[in-house]
């Protein structure tokens, strides 16, 4: 109940401190819930708003918070029976070179393949379906029922070695100067709730903050995902449709 909700003025490290306090109590009393949702969302950042943390500092705090969470769980008595799924809430229409819908995703478990990059095309629904299968619950909708579970990320041999969070390699309190690229526009944007800022404009502000004021952000790429149909199959489907109409 004391876990801070959305507020970019509260560090994700503070959020993890609150979560850790409760998690240690669960370790003592054995009452850890079967399923938890943990939001550490300050990697949204406030762009280059003067005086706020830089995008680099916000993301570094977020990374360290996640690392501390994984370290705590992997060193706990629950590790052998736990999987941690990490996903952005929204791809934000970013300048990904393959498709603007793509998001980085991580699965951390004693039963995931370590050091493995799974290039299978999964969806958010597929991640939900994987959680449902682990928990032994039915799909919530037709979308997760039909989605590909993340089978390829897992193995049947456990590696119980714990993880250790790496220390931050940059200043976690780095602030935006008044003359940062996009500072004036960032001051006008609404950060009181998630994803209220125009995504492409905000992406460009962050891009220039990280890559340099004179750098050019690539335009978003939007790929089409279609089911390939053999010509013979298509003709058979048309014939079947005509028979049904008759």
Q: What are the residue ranges of the model-derived segments?
A:
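N-terminal pro-sequences and low-complexity stem/linker regions of secreted or lumenal proteins
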Residues: 1-246
């Amino acid at each position: 109940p004391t876990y801070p909700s959305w507020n970019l003025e509260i560090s994700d490290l503070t959020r993890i401190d609150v979560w850790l306090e409760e998690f240690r109590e669960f370790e003592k009393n054995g009452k850890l819930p079967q399923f938890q949702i943990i939001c550490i969302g300050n990697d949204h950042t406030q762009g280059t708003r003067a005086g706020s943390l830089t995008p680099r500092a916000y993301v570094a705090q977020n990374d360290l918070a996640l690392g501390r969470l994984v370290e705590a769980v992997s060193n706990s008595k629950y590790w052998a029976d736990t999987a941690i799924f990490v996903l952005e809430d929204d791809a934000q229409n970013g300048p990904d070179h393959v498709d603007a819908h793509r998001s980085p995703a991580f699965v951390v478990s004693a039963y995931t393949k370590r050091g493995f990059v799974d290039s299978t095309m999964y969806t958010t629904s597929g991640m939900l379906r994987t959680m449902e299968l682990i928990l032994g619950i039915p799909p919530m909708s037709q979308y997760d029922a039909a989605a590909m579970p993340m089978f390829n990320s897992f193995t049947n041999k456990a590696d119980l070695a714990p993880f250790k969070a790496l220390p931050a390699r940059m200043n976690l309190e780095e602030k935006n100067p008044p003359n940062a690229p996009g500072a004036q526009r960032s001051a006008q944007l609404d950060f009181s709730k998630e994803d209220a800022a125009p995504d492409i404009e905000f992406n460009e502000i962050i891009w220039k903050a990280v890559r340099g004021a004179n750098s050019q952000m690539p335009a978003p790429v939007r790929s089409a995902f279609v089911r390939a149909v053999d010509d013979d199959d298509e003709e058979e489907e048309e014939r079947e449709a005509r028979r049904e109409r008759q």
